[in-house]
Amino acid sequence: VGNKGKGESVWLGFFQYKVLSEFSKICEYYGEKLGREKQAVNNDNLNSSSEINHETEIKRAERYRKIMENLRKALNTNAWDGRWYKRAFMDDGNELGSIQNEECRIDSIAQSWATISGAGDNDKKYISMESLEKHLIDKEAGIIKLLDPPFEKSKLEPGYIKAYIPGTRENGGQYTHGAIWAIIAEAMLGFGDKATEYFRMINPIEHSRTKEEA
């Protein structure tokens, strides 16, 4: 977060972990496939590029897994804030989504993706989702907030979302695909009843069954 290129996004760290996890499987599969093809033909007739690709893909998968290991360690130490994961680190070292913040103390996406990515430590995944439920599930309004409290008076400059009225859109309102990620995370943790409840809660149909609700 910031224009100096020093800021880091925690949720994108989880996203990168997931991407590397999926691509390492592809690289490993492709490398093993080429390896089997190598064994099936006479070495004299082997296309040299296939041999190079076999070694390259296996090494690529190993490199990705090493990056994943380092990412997971960093996310579960530097980004863990005691009850949930922070959202981001700004250029100047300030944090978003920290318990210490007056605004944007907690963000939904970092909690959801700790589970979706598979990178969150087992106990921390459950603790962070409990915090999400406590601070971001608004059953009265029927929404799952992106963050809370919204940006309004603090000196933090997170970008364009601060221009939105507090409690609307990304600034403390519902960011719907972020809300869906929270529901997916609940389901992945085995809380099917909660996932169903929250899905029904945010369903637009449930917000327009009567003229008053609409």
Stretch-by-stretch model annotation:
Residues 1-214:
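Acidic, mature catalytic/reactive cores of soluble proteins
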